[in-house]
């Protein structure tokens, strides 16, 4: 039986590790990065009156937007302040009104 040369074995290991890293990058890191960017843009586009859902499942209407917090009106007399990161989506069926550009 022939034995592989040490250089060939080392080259195979390097190629294998690079392939593992590339798979890890394209299957885990890149999709998470895209999702973070999408969520950041979503948070920047929020305005008063938008109907949203929090990560804990609370539905409400945006009444105030701070630097790091958002206050939602969840009932007639109930307002709750959340961290911006807790807002995850618009309510189903809610259509955001686009500002008209003249």
Curated annotation (Swiss-Prot):
UniProt-listed Pfam families: YajC (PF02699)
Keyword Ion transport applies: no
Key words of the record: Cell inner membrane, Cell membrane, Membrane, Protein transport, Translocation, Transmembrane, Transmembrane helix, Transport
Residues passing through the membrane, by range: 9-29
Swiss-Prot/TrEMBL GO biological process terms: protein transport
Record-level GO cellular component terms: plasma membrane
Cellular location(s): Cell inner membrane
InterPro entries cross-referenced by the UniProt entry: Preprotein_translocase_YajC
Signal peptide annotation: none
Membrane topology: Single-pass membrane protein
Similarity annotation: Belongs to the YajC family.
Assembly description: Part of the SecDF-YidC-YajC translocase complex. The SecDF-YidC-YajC translocase forms a supercomplex with SecYEG, called the holo-translocon (HTL).
Function: The SecYEG-SecDF-YajC-YidC holo-translocon (HTL) protein secretase/insertase is a supercomplex required for protein secretion, insertion of proteins into membranes, and assembly of membrane protein complexes. While the SecYEG complex is essential for assembly of a number of proteins and complexes, the SecDF-YajC-YidC subcomplex facilitates these functions.
Name of the protein this chain belongs to: Sec translocon accessory complex subunit YajC
């Amino acid at each position: 039986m022939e034995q592989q040369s040490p250089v060939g074995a080392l080259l195979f290991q390097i190629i294998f590790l690079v392939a593992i890293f590339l798979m890890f990058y394209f299957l885990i890191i890149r999709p998470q990065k895209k999702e973070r960017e999408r969520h950041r843009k979503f948070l920047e586009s929020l305005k008063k009156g938008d109907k949203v859902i929090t990560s804990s499942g609370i539905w409400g209407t945006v009444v105030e937007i701070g630097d790091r917090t958002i206050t939602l009106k969840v009932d007639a007399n109930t307002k709750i302040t959340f961290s911006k990161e807790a807002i995850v989506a618009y309510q189903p069926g809610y259509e955001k009104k686009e500002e008209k550009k003249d």
